[in-house]
Amino acid sequence: MNHLLEFYGTECPHCVRMHELVEKLEKEEGIKIESLEVWHNPENEKRLLELDKEFCGGVPFFYNLKTNKWICGETSYDNFKKWARGEDFNQEE
């Protein structure tokens, strides 16, 4: 199992924009992120709710299982890359 998780909704425009950053990160840095659709998959939705703990309350939601840090919504590519690497990042960006 990958330690970086992306929770998204198929019809979510913010999720579509952030998934472009996921693909860029995977291509440029070789960092893999497990993508989990939650609007049409009850098992993935349950996992989201377990990890989210009302931090975000929606998607896109990104969770790093190694650092227990998350990103809610959209963020910049540089901030996203720092989160994925386990570096200090701006959780409010």
Predicted regions and their residues:
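Generic recognition of short, well-ordered alpha-helical segments
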Residues: 16-20, 46, 75
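Short Fe-S-cluster ligation motifs
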Residues: 41-57
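Local sequence-structure signature of Cys/Sec-based thiol-disulfide redox active-site neighborhoods
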Residues: 1-34
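Short alpha-helical
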Residues: 13-14, 42-43, 78
